Amino acid sequence: MTAPIALALDAPDLDTACRWANAVDGVFSHVKVGLETYLRDGALGVAEIRAAAPHCALFLDLKLHDIPNTMVGAARSVADLQPDLLTVHAAAGHAGIAAVAEALPQTKVAAVTVLTSLSAV
């Protein structure tokens, strides 16, 4: 049985992220790929992370925030990764959040209301 824990793969490089993901495969429920890792390693990197942890769900923490049309386009661009969970920023509003949820019906959409650290902004 896996623990309902998500490991944040905020690693310095893809190799380290894959090693960390593999280490928790079957133990933790999710691996979390954030914006920095996604932009650095791209969809192919995320696919490598998924392959390293095939028993973990993919939590894609991109915090999408734009007009609804653009959010849908961004969500569709990651659809091939089959994220189990995708984050959007709550400030995008109901229309944006609902549009992403409709565009990716197999993905849970979580709205982030406050960033972890506002002091660094």
Q: Over which residues does each language-model region extend?
A:
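Short, acidic/polar
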Residues: 12-23, 68-77
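Short, well-ordered alpha-helical microsegments
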Residues: 17, 42, 46, 93-97
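Metabolite-binding pocket within alpha/beta catalytic cores that recognizes anionic/polar moieties
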Residues: 32-85
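Conserved anion-binding
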Residues: 2, 66-121
